Amino acid sequence: MPDLLIELFSEEIPARMQARAREDLKKLVTDGLVEAGLTYASAGAFSTPRRLVLSVEGLSAESPTLREERKGPKADAPAAAIEGFLRSTGLTRDQLETREDKKGAVLFAVVEKPGRPAPEIVAEVLERTIRTFPWPKSMRWGTGSLRWVRPLQSILCLLSDEAGAEVVPMTLDGLTAGNSTEGHRFMAPARFAVSGFEDYRAKLARAFVMLDASEREQAIWHEATTQAFAQGLEVVPDAALLSEVAGLVEWPVVLMGAIGEDFLGLPPEVLQTSMREHQKFFSVTNPATGRIEKFVTVANRETADHGETILKGNGKVLSARLSDARFFWENDLRTVKTAGLEGMAEGLKQVTFHNRLGSQAARIARIEALAREIAPLVGASPDLAAEAARVAKADLQSAMVGEFPELQGTMGSYYARAAGLPEAVAQACKAHYQPLGPSDAVPTDPVSVAVALADKIDTLAGFWRIGEKPTGSKDPFALRRAALGVIRLLLTNNSRAGLMGIMLPAMNRHLEPFDTSDFTPYERDLLAFFHDRLKVHLREQGIRHDVIDACLAMPGNDDLTLLVKRAEALSAFLKTDDGTNLLQGFKRANNILTQAEAKDGVEYSFGADPKFAETDAERALFAALETAEAAIGPALQAEDFAAAMSAMAALRAPIDAFFETVQVNADNAVLRRNRLNMLHSIRATCARVADLTRIEG
């Protein structure tokens, strides 16, 4: 079975597009081959800045012959009907078969489609793939109609096996497929022929091209860390930058340079961001001083002077970039020292947050008021929380954040310290944006927690009030992320702040610009949104959705910390034998009771009377219910849900024995009513812990 090698050689492919392009090339080609009847053993896609490559192993040499039977008209049908059938099948009358069925003689056509050779299929699939390739952006060049991310220069398409290699014959807008490619643009630009994937990969390596992006990443990181270690330094990890740089070079050459002394006083985040965003440099820190003192750059070629000229040029460009950053830094510090952070924030009055939610300054005023109200609930000083909220977004008006928006919050913390504000306020300037995602760090300082909650809840309340809710996959204002942030803030800090209590003032503040209609539906809808996000969060931690629903149905479901404690205890309980068996007993009791209440048109909620117990099983269940009630109440009061579940588990054996020996729907009406009331007691006792009717199984 032959192997297939495809290389699409072009001008430089943007690094950010390469990973997706590898996946698309593999999927489009292999799916097309399979749809055409070819099978394969394995496939792998690769990329460098100038080439997309696909290797398919164990490809079948041809597609199978297909035999199709088509039923036609009756043998004695009008000639016109038979002629139409013949045209549709491409057969003649004598090629049809006549078969008997229950309606008489019927004509059948047996159409055989012979298999097609792999080269023919590959050529069709590859041309379709190239013409329909889903680049985020593409271009045309010359006079042809072909579109590609950058001008496509050559196509290598080769089928090879033990007998040799065969070029797949195809021509696309003047490009004819061949068996040759080029090496490194500067170090080995000559074309060379290949006979298969292994030969291709080996010759590329000799021509200074490292084909596999992951290998380039490993080579860059290994060499960078080795050079840093030799000087007692450490490279700052940056996975995204490493992936991007690996997509910029075919033959990585790691070089380390020094940052000028004049710039070492800049905040490390400024140095790292400026070098990463503008120069694609890695930052190198000195563990002894904690400063970023050097940088790592990755060249795309080896040079006779071992990179000295490259480093010199990069150093000049870096100095210019860092001079700009130093200007922004010094200018911002002067503003802070003369006008303070609140003075810096004055410009936010002219910055619109949303055309229906007012300016950034108006939003900050709402967050300040809300942070003051939330502060006592999370153990923070109301005055400190209000002060932090008032200045937390001041750096949005700074020159540094104007140049590097990703430094918002970080620069605010530096400027707050420069202004002499309390450390808790400085920390909150940075931390109030957190957590930014499911794995981001969660603030724990009370002032930071208060401001972070106020920021996110104001955002949610505002957009909810104007009807800008997430729909399907669309969430332009990142409201799902904001809700998850609130959830993680409350749970991580074990906060008992009820969502309804902190959403109410937020909703109130958003009423003023609108009508004064009842906002309760908005508040309830937003609480339901929080519950949906909580379900997703807990499911990722292994708690079933029905367990969460059973706890959401309980009172106080806006206290997320309490709700999660209950859900964790119930989840653990249901994994035990006692939990599983008690659930079955509860469901049996609930089903019998529900059917009886529907049939009789009454609710059996009166207390069962022990004096009507006729059997030992009934008396034992009465005693067990009394004991469980006595234990569950204090356990719930103490929020010891594990103890409440344990008390509930003690009902398992008495309930089992009751159903084994007692007929609930007795002929005696008094006994039947008393036993149904007992089933209600079982339901009511269990319902104090969780709504078990919502548990599946």
From Swiss-Prot:
InterPro entries: DALR_anticod-bd, Gly-tRNA-synth_bsu, Gly-tRNA-synth_heterodimer. It is found in: Cytoplasm. Pfam families: DALR_1, tRNA_synt_2f. One of its GO terms (biological process) is glycyl-tRNA aminoacylation. Its EC number is 6.1.1.14. One of its GO terms (cellular component) is cytosol. It is an enzyme of class 6 (ligase). It comes from the Bacteria. It catalyses: tRNA(Gly) + glycine + ATP = glycyl-tRNA(Gly) + AMP + diphosphate. One of its GO terms (molecular function) is arginine-tRNA ligase activity. The keyword Ligase applies. Keywords: Aminoacyl-tRNA synthetase, ATP-binding, Cytoplasm, Ligase, Nucleotide-binding, Protein biosynthesis. Its main location: cytoplasm. NCBIfam families: glyS (TIGR00211). Tetramer of two alpha and two beta subunits. Belongs to the class-II aminoacyl-tRNA synthetase family. This is Glycine--tRNA ligase beta subunit. The gene is glyS.
